[in-house]
Protein backbone atom coordinates (compact mmCIF):
# COMPACT_ATOMS: atom_id res chain seq x y z
CA UNK A 1 0.00 0.00 0.00
CA UNK A 2 1.27 3.46 -0.95
CA UNK A 3 0.81 6.03 1.84
CA UNK A 4 1.43 9.77 1.67
CA UNK A 5 1.69 11.79 4.89
CA UNK A 6 0.98 15.50 4.88
CA UNK A 7 3.07 16.52 7.87
CA UNK A 8 6.06 14.70 9.29
CA UNK A 9 5.95 15.41 13.02
CA UNK A 10 6.10 13.04 15.98
CA UNK A 11 2.82 11.26 15.34
CA UNK A 12 3.52 10.75 11.65
CA UNK A 13 6.96 9.45 12.56
CA UNK A 14 5.41 7.04 15.08
CA UNK A 15 2.98 5.68 12.51
CA UNK A 16 5.70 5.28 9.90
CA UNK A 17 7.84 3.49 12.47
CA UNK A 18 5.00 1.10 13.23
CA UNK A 19 4.39 0.40 9.56
CA UNK A 20 8.05 -0.28 8.87
CA UNK A 21 8.30 -2.52 11.94
CA UNK A 22 5.45 -4.56 10.49
CA UNK A 23 7.24 -5.01 7.21
CA UNK A 24 6.10 -2.03 5.14
CA UNK A 25 8.54 -0.86 2.48
CA UNK A 26 9.78 2.66 3.33
CA UNK A 27 9.88 3.27 -0.42
CA UNK A 28 6.08 3.03 -0.47
CA UNK A 29 5.80 5.91 2.02
CA UNK A 30 5.98 9.58 1.13
CA UNK A 31 6.03 12.49 3.54
CA UNK A 32 5.43 16.16 2.83
CA UNK A 33 7.24 18.12 5.56
CA UNK A 34 8.35 21.76 5.17
CA UNK A 35 10.99 21.65 7.93
CA UNK A 36 14.37 20.70 6.46
CA UNK A 37 15.70 19.23 9.69
CA UNK A 38 12.69 17.01 10.25
CA UNK A 39 12.78 15.75 6.66
CA UNK A 40 16.43 14.84 7.09
CA UNK A 41 15.74 12.98 10.33
CA UNK A 42 12.93 10.99 8.74
CA UNK A 43 14.99 9.97 5.72
CA UNK A 44 17.91 8.98 7.95
CA UNK A 45 15.67 6.93 10.24
CA UNK A 46 13.77 5.25 7.39
CA UNK A 47 16.13 4.74 4.44
CA UNK A 48 14.19 4.66 1.21
CA UNK A 49 11.37 6.89 2.45
CA UNK A 50 10.55 9.70 0.04
CA UNK A 51 10.28 13.16 1.56
CA UNK A 52 9.50 16.51 -0.04
CA UNK A 53 8.81 20.04 1.11
CA UNK A 54 5.65 20.87 -0.82
CA UNK A 55 2.21 19.44 -1.55
CA UNK A 56 2.14 18.81 -5.28
CA UNK A 57 0.35 16.44 -7.60
CA UNK A 58 3.42 14.21 -7.65
CA UNK A 59 3.27 13.29 -3.97
CA UNK A 60 -0.32 12.05 -4.29
CA UNK A 61 0.19 10.13 -7.52
CA UNK A 62 -0.40 6.45 -6.88
CA UNK A 63 -1.26 6.94 -3.20
CA UNK A 64 -3.78 4.52 -1.71
CA UNK A 65 -4.10 6.59 1.44
CA UNK A 66 -3.31 10.20 2.32
CA UNK A 67 -2.76 10.91 6.03
CA UNK A 68 -3.15 14.48 7.26
CA UNK A 69 -0.84 14.80 10.27
CA UNK A 70 -0.55 18.57 10.68
CA UNK A 71 -1.76 20.87 13.45
CA UNK A 72 -5.48 21.74 13.38
CA UNK A 73 -4.81 25.38 12.50
CA UNK A 74 -2.76 24.24 9.49
CA UNK A 75 -5.35 21.84 8.13
CA UNK A 76 -7.30 24.15 5.87
CA UNK A 77 -4.20 25.35 4.01
CA UNK A 78 -2.77 21.84 3.81
CA UNK A 79 -6.01 20.41 2.46
CA UNK A 80 -6.55 23.15 -0.08
CA UNK A 81 -3.00 22.68 -1.35
CA UNK A 82 -3.70 19.08 -2.37
CA UNK A 83 -7.40 19.46 -3.20
CA UNK A 84 -6.87 19.65 -6.99
CA UNK A 85 -5.10 16.28 -6.94
CA UNK A 86 -6.93 14.24 -4.28
CA UNK A 87 -9.94 12.93 -6.23
CA UNK A 88 -8.28 9.69 -7.45
CA UNK A 89 -6.98 8.77 -3.98
CA UNK A 90 -9.01 5.88 -2.48
CA UNK A 91 -8.92 7.16 1.12
CA UNK A 92 -7.99 10.10 3.35
CA UNK A 93 -7.18 9.80 7.06
CA UNK A 94 -6.94 12.80 9.38
CA UNK A 95 -5.41 12.68 12.86
CA UNK A 96 -5.76 16.41 13.55
CA UNK A 97 -7.70 17.15 16.74
CA UNK A 98 -11.01 18.93 16.26
CA UNK A 99 -11.08 18.83 12.46
CA UNK A 100 -14.44 17.40 11.44
CA UNK A 101 -14.94 15.25 8.39
CA UNK A 102 -17.42 17.66 6.83
CA UNK A 103 -14.96 20.54 7.05
CA UNK A 104 -12.05 18.54 5.68
CA UNK A 105 -14.29 17.32 2.87
CA UNK A 106 -15.23 20.92 2.08
CA UNK A 107 -11.59 22.03 2.02
CA UNK A 108 -10.83 19.10 -0.29
CA UNK A 109 -13.51 20.17 -2.75
CA UNK A 110 -16.17 17.71 -1.60
CA UNK A 111 -13.94 14.64 -1.25
CA UNK A 112 -16.14 11.93 0.36
CA UNK A 113 -13.88 9.08 1.56
CA UNK A 114 -12.57 10.39 4.86
CA UNK A 115 -11.67 8.62 8.10
CA UNK A 116 -11.03 10.71 11.19
CA UNK A 117 -8.96 9.39 14.08
CA UNK A 118 -7.71 10.45 17.48
CA UNK A 119 -4.46 8.67 18.38
CA UNK A 120 -2.32 9.38 21.44
CA UNK A 121 1.36 9.79 22.13
CA UNK A 122 2.06 6.27 23.48
CA UNK A 123 1.92 5.42 19.77
CA UNK A 124 5.53 6.62 19.80
CA UNK A 125 6.44 3.34 21.52
CA UNK A 126 3.84 1.18 19.79
CA UNK A 127 1.50 1.31 22.78
CA UNK A 128 -1.05 3.86 21.61
CA UNK A 129 -4.78 3.64 21.27
CA UNK A 130 -6.63 5.32 18.41
CA UNK A 131 -10.35 5.81 17.99
CA UNK A 132 -11.62 6.10 14.42
CA UNK A 133 -14.75 7.36 12.70
CA UNK A 134 -15.56 6.89 9.02
CA UNK A 135 -17.84 9.12 6.97
CA UNK A 136 -21.03 7.42 5.74
CA UNK A 137 -20.20 5.38 2.68
CA UNK A 138 -16.47 5.30 3.44
CA UNK A 139 -16.30 1.59 4.32
CA UNK A 140 -13.51 0.87 1.86
CA UNK A 141 -11.55 3.85 3.16
CA UNK A 142 -11.94 2.53 6.70
CA UNK A 143 -10.36 -0.76 5.68
CA UNK A 144 -7.34 1.10 4.32
CA UNK A 145 -6.97 3.39 7.34
CA UNK A 146 -7.33 0.80 10.11
CA UNK A 147 -4.07 -1.13 9.61
CA UNK A 148 -2.08 2.11 9.47
CA UNK A 149 -3.06 2.97 13.04
CA UNK A 150 -3.00 -0.63 14.21
CA UNK A 151 0.71 -0.52 13.43
CA UNK A 152 1.29 1.63 16.52
CA UNK A 153 -1.26 0.31 19.00
CA UNK A 154 -4.88 -0.62 19.57
CA UNK A 155 -7.82 0.79 17.62
CA UNK A 156 -11.49 1.29 18.36
CA UNK A 157 -14.31 2.55 16.14
CA UNK A 158 -17.06 4.99 17.09
CA UNK A 159 -20.37 5.39 15.28
CA UNK A 160 -20.88 9.07 16.10
CA UNK A 161 -18.28 11.62 15.11
CA UNK A 162 -19.16 13.87 18.04
CA UNK A 163 -17.90 11.16 20.40
CA UNK A 164 -14.38 11.98 19.25
CA UNK A 165 -14.50 15.12 21.40
CA UNK A 166 -14.85 12.91 24.48
CA UNK A 167 -12.20 10.56 23.14
CA UNK A 168 -9.85 13.50 22.68
CA UNK A 169 -10.36 14.45 26.33
CA UNK A 170 -9.92 10.92 27.67
CA UNK A 171 -7.27 9.14 25.63
CA UNK A 172 -5.92 11.94 23.44
CA UNK A 173 -5.09 14.20 26.39
CA UNK A 174 -4.97 11.30 28.84
CA UNK A 175 -1.21 10.71 28.74
CA UNK A 176 -0.71 14.24 30.10
CA UNK A 177 -2.92 13.41 33.09
CA UNK A 178 -0.93 10.25 33.76
CA UNK A 179 2.35 12.16 33.54
CA UNK A 180 0.92 14.81 35.89
CA UNK A 181 0.21 12.23 38.60
CA UNK A 182 3.48 10.44 37.89
CA UNK A 183 5.31 13.73 38.37
CA UNK A 184 3.45 14.38 41.63
CA UNK A 185 4.25 10.93 43.03
CA UNK A 186 7.91 11.38 42.15
CA UNK A 187 7.97 14.82 43.78
CA UNK A 188 6.32 13.47 46.93
CA UNK A 189 8.97 10.77 47.19
CA UNK A 190 11.73 13.37 46.93
CA UNK A 191 10.08 15.58 49.56
CA UNK A 192 9.94 12.56 51.84
CA UNK A 193 13.70 12.31 51.60
CA UNK A 194 14.26 9.66 48.95
CA UNK A 195 17.07 10.17 46.40
CA UNK A 196 15.82 11.54 43.08
CA UNK A 197 16.82 8.47 41.06
CA UNK A 198 15.11 6.15 43.52
CA UNK A 199 12.02 8.37 43.62
CA UNK A 200 11.66 8.21 39.85
CA UNK A 201 12.22 4.46 39.74
CA UNK A 202 9.60 3.86 42.44
CA UNK A 203 7.04 6.13 40.78
CA UNK A 204 7.51 4.62 37.33
CA UNK A 205 7.45 1.04 38.57
CA UNK A 206 4.33 1.71 40.62
CA UNK A 207 2.44 3.07 37.62
CA UNK A 208 3.63 0.33 35.29
CA UNK A 209 2.92 -2.45 37.75
CA UNK A 210 -0.48 -1.10 38.70
CA UNK A 211 -1.55 -0.94 35.06
CA UNK A 212 -0.37 -4.50 34.45
CA UNK A 213 -2.34 -5.61 37.48
CA UNK A 214 -5.46 -3.74 36.35
CA UNK A 215 -5.34 -5.04 32.78
CA UNK A 216 -4.80 -8.59 33.94
CA UNK A 217 -7.60 -8.52 36.49
CA UNK A 218 -11.34 -8.99 36.12
CA UNK A 219 -11.88 -6.64 39.06
CA UNK A 220 -12.96 -3.02 38.65
CA UNK A 221 -10.45 -0.30 39.56
CA UNK A 222 -12.51 0.57 42.63
CA UNK A 223 -12.13 -2.99 43.91
CA UNK A 224 -8.41 -3.02 43.23
CA UNK A 225 -8.10 0.26 45.11
CA UNK A 226 -10.08 -1.14 48.04
CA UNK A 227 -7.81 -4.16 48.11
CA UNK A 228 -4.86 -1.89 48.91
CA UNK A 229 -6.74 0.15 51.49
CA UNK A 230 -6.99 -0.99 55.11
CA UNK A 231 -9.18 0.93 57.54
CA UNK A 232 -7.03 3.32 59.51
CA UNK A 233 -3.95 2.44 57.46
CA UNK A 234 -1.46 4.45 55.44
CA UNK A 235 -3.34 4.22 52.13
CA UNK A 236 -6.57 5.29 53.80
CA UNK A 237 -4.80 8.33 55.23
CA UNK A 238 -3.65 9.34 51.75
CA UNK A 239 -7.04 8.78 50.14
CA UNK A 240 -8.76 10.76 52.91
CA UNK A 241 -6.64 13.77 51.96
CA UNK A 242 -7.53 13.36 48.28
CA UNK A 243 -11.23 13.03 49.10
CA UNK A 244 -11.15 16.09 51.37
CA UNK A 245 -9.61 18.08 48.54
CA UNK A 246 -12.25 16.98 46.05
CA UNK A 247 -9.57 15.58 43.77
CA UNK A 248 -11.87 13.09 42.03
CA UNK A 249 -14.49 15.72 41.19
CA UNK A 250 -11.90 18.23 40.06
CA UNK A 251 -10.21 15.64 37.88
CA UNK A 252 -13.51 14.76 36.22
CA UNK A 253 -14.14 18.48 35.69
CA UNK A 254 -10.73 18.75 34.04
CA UNK A 255 -11.51 15.98 31.56
CA UNK A 256 -14.86 17.59 30.78
CA UNK A 257 -13.06 20.90 30.17
CA UNK A 258 -10.82 19.18 27.65
CA UNK A 259 -13.87 17.77 25.86
CA UNK A 260 -15.52 21.19 25.78
CA UNK A 261 -12.34 22.66 24.33
CA UNK A 262 -12.28 20.00 21.63
CA UNK A 263 -15.84 20.88 20.67
CA UNK A 264 -15.05 24.60 20.64
CA UNK A 265 -12.00 24.00 18.47
CA UNK A 266 -14.12 22.08 15.98
CA UNK A 267 -16.70 24.86 15.95
CA UNK A 268 -14.03 27.47 15.28
CA UNK A 269 -12.44 25.46 12.47
CA UNK A 270 -15.86 24.93 10.90
CA UNK A 271 -16.10 28.68 10.31
CA UNK A 272 -13.04 28.70 8.02
Feature map (PLM): residue ranges:
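Short acidic capping loops at alpha-helix termini that bridge into adjacent secondary structure
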Residues: 26-29, 88-90, 113, 197
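Small-residue helix-packing motif on alpha-helices
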Residues: 29, 59, 195-202, 224
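Short pre-catalytic strand/loop immediately N-terminal to key active-site residues, enriched for Gly-Thr
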Residues: 163-169, 221-226
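NAD(P)-dependent Rossmann-like dehydrogenase/reductase catalytic/cofactor-binding core
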Residues: 204-272
Amino acid sequence: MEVTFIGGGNMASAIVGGLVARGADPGAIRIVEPQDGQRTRLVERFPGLRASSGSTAGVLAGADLVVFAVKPQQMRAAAQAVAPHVAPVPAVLTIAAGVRCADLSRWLGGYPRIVRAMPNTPALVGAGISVLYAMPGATAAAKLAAPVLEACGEILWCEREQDLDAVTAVSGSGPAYVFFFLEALEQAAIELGLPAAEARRLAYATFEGSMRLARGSSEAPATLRANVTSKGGTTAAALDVLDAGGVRARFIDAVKAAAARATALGDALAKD
